[in-house]
Amino acid sequence: IAHEVNNTTAGITSTLDTVEQALSSEEGMEDICDVMRVCTDRCFSMSRFITRFADVVKIPEPTVAQVQLNELVSMCKRFMEGMCNDRNIILRLECDPEVGQVRLDASLFEQVLVNIIKNAAESIESAGEAAGKQGEITVRTTVPALIEIVDNGPGISKETEAKLFSPFFSTKPNGQGIGLVFIREVLSRHGCAFSLRTYNDGLTRFRILFN
């Protein structure tokens, strides 16, 4: 699996680099080139992650460093924007400028945030037009060091909430229940407190608090 993933990401990054170089001299292409660089960085991050994962045949232990939390969250938001746009979901970013650096493994945390946003988008999409409202996801940081991903999807029942982080439990028809277990393990290894539930205002919040 690692071999196939790395071969694929290598091909993608090579193509992105070629296209970026071709467009970089064109007027009005700055934003497109910027998005391409974000995608390239994400491919490299995925390659590093899958290689480390395969080396130990388990979730790798975090290799932590000081990371600017707002920059990490902003990058993930930009990476997931296209997927949300395709689903007619508005993806917002609200970063508190007072939030500073935290010690974390950037590659692992990128995977966590991508999984959370993807799950929120799929939840909103599952409700479809029956929900009768615009789908929205907000990624927010607040002091001292909190990440909150909020969505206005159909919500989570108390019964489901109690099972969410159990292996092989999934609310998706073809789900394998691996994503949330991965998230749980990574957050636990970082010493983070976290929760996922639907509140009385009808919004579902995934909260991650750094110690």
Which role fits each region the language model picked out?
Residues I1-N211:
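Core catalytic ATP-binding domain of two-component histidine kinases
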